[in-house]
Amino acid sequence: MTVSNASYLKTFYDKTVAHGAKVISSDFTLEIEGFEDYWLLCKQAPWPELSSQGEIEIPTPLGSMMYQPQQIRTAQQGQISFYETVVGDIDNLMLELITQSGAYSGARSTFNCKIYEGTPEKYLRYKRLIDCFVQLDTVDRDWENRTQPLMVQGTMFFHYFGETVEGNSSDYN
C-alpha cells in the first residue's frame, strides 16, 4: 500500500476543489412537452452528450493504420424509468404518446422533452431532446415485494443536436 505525505495529497485536493462543485446524478428532471405535470414521476432518464459515433480505421503504408472520428452521434438512446400511480398515470401517458402525431408525416408516438439539471422551476441548464419515443420493458410484479413502488422501465430513443439552454438558478435555490 502506498503511503503519500499529506502535503503531496493536499496538491490533488486543491486541484480538485479548483474545478468546482461536482454535478450530482440525482439532480435532474425530465419534462415531456404537452405533459408537463408528469415530471415528478420520472425516476431515471438518459443525459445526452455529443461525441463521435466511433472510429474510422485508415490503412497506411507498411501495414500500419490510423484513426479518424466518425460523424457526431445525434441519434441516441438510454434507460428511462417512471413511478406508476394508483390511477395509472404512466399507463395513460404511454397511450397518449402512442396516439399523438409525431414529427414525421404519418408517424405517431414521437414527442419532444427537456431534461433539466435541477427542476423546471429552478435549473442550471436544460437540454432539449426531439423526436423521442419509448420502448417499455414488460413490467414484473411480485407478491413478495411490498417495499417498492411499481416501476415502469424501458429505453428512450431520441435525437440531441447540442441544444443547451442556460438556467435561471446557480444553485437550485
Description of each model-found segment:
Residues 7, 151-153, 157-173:
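Protruding loop/beta-arch "assembly-hinge" segments enriched in small, turn-prone residues
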Residues 69, 104-108, 139-142, 152-162:
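Glycine-rich loops and low-complexity Gly/Arg-rich segments
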Residues 88-126:
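Acidic, glycine-rich loop-and-strand cores that form catalytic or ligand-binding grooves
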